[in-house]
Amino acid sequence: MTISVFDTFFEKFIKTTRGSDLEPFQDELAASLESHFFSKRHGRKTEWDDALATLPKLEPKHFDLGQDLIQIGENSDLTISTEDFKAKLKGFMPWRKGPYELFGTNINTEWRSDWKWQRIVPHISSLQDKQVLDIGCGNGYHLFRMLASGAKLALGI
């Protein structure tokens, strides 16, 4: 993860949690995140950082987090060709959990996180205006679904 991505994420986190019960933990969390993201604990971290660096900065005009297929952006938002975008996404394979559609490109995943969501959602209380901590969040699929269900904050570690 590049420092600019980390800084952008953390600036948004600081702003979102200001005045909340999480505010006292901001400094400790920042130090932990920095230590985690800049360590080389995962064998493919360097490879994935390099793949991330090849992607253009994209700003989705549309996203839908409330459906089984999480959609982020549309093909018309791409600043490179669809073929180039698909080739760059292959740098992150294998895609373990989904389903996702990124800027018009369907990501074929090994596991269906939507099936798990469909099983658990009838058994959880309303997430409206809640702050949710998802321990072991993996790729964030369920965080997106929690936000779409009205969570004020969904934080995955």
Each predicted region: which residue ranges?
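N-terminal accessory regions of S-adenosyl-L-methionine
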Residues: M1-S113
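Conserved alpha-helix/loop element of class I SAM-dependent methyltransferases that forms part
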Residues: E110-K130
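Structured loop/turn residues at beta-strand edges in well-structured enzyme cores
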Residues: K130, S149-K152
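Conserved class I S-adenosyl-L-methionine
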Residues: K130-G138
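Conserved SAM-binding loop of SAM-dependent methyltransferases across substrates and taxa
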Residues: N139-G150
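Conserved SAM-binding motif I beta-strand of class I
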Residues: L153-I157
